[in-house]
Amino acid sequence: MSTPSGSNPLPMADKLEAKGGNGGKIWDDGVHEGVSQIYIQEGSTGGIASIKFDYVKNGQPKAGSTHGNSYQNFTEWFDLNHTCDEHILSVKCYYDEGEIQGLVIKTNIRTSAYMGYNIGTTFTLEVKGKKIVGFHGSFDKNLTSLGAYFAPLSPAK
């Protein structure tokens, strides 16, 4: 398969099933070169009311879609330095009462602070030796489930 001049081919990726609650509207951002930013809006009574992922396309940031109820501004965000090949290795999710309550992002360089609420049981989206290149999940009143696409790590330069 040929690639248009000036564009990078998308990595081969494995889809890790969404975890968390059931039901709600399913969304899928697909596969990208990488993730550049993550934004969340905390729910007024717990959970994550909305989430947005910005991605990397042809080495440049590309705005993603907002998933959920974006009735206010995002309350927390996490920027990745994709120009220095910072990439997400795992996402630790806090889950309670049928909703994702919070996230902790681990990259090859650092780990984020809690985003949202650190209550409930945890699960981790992670595949050893791979990086996250896209997200999918579902929403009802708040974020109910989260899954990810994983691609092989680039060889060290």
Swiss-Prot record:
Keyword check for Transcription regulation, yes or no: no
Q: Which organism is it from?
A: Arabidopsis thaliana (Mouse-ear cress)
Query: Sorted alphabetically, which InterPro entries does this protein's record hold?
Result: Jacalin-like_lectin_dom, Jacalin-like_lectin_dom_plant, Jacalin-like_lectin_dom_sf
Enumerate the PANTHER family for this protein. GENOME ASSEMBLY, CHROMOSOME: A06 (PTHR47293:SF21), JACALIN-RELATED LECTIN 3 (PTHR47293)
Which protein are we looking at?
A: Jacalin-related lectin 15
Q: In which tissues is it expressed?
A: Expressed in stems, leaves and flowers. Not detected in roots.
Q: What does this protein do?
A: Confers broad resistance to potexviruses. Inhibits virus accumulation at the cellular level.
Q: Which gene encodes it?
A: JAL15
- Record keywords: Metal-binding included? no
Q: Where is the Jacalin-type lectin domain?
A: 13-152
Description of what induces expression: Not induced upon virus infection.
Q: A GO molecular-function term, please?
A: carbohydrate binding
Q: Which CDD domains match?
A: Jacalin
Gene3D superfamilies, per the entry: Jacalin-like lectin domain (2.100.10.30)
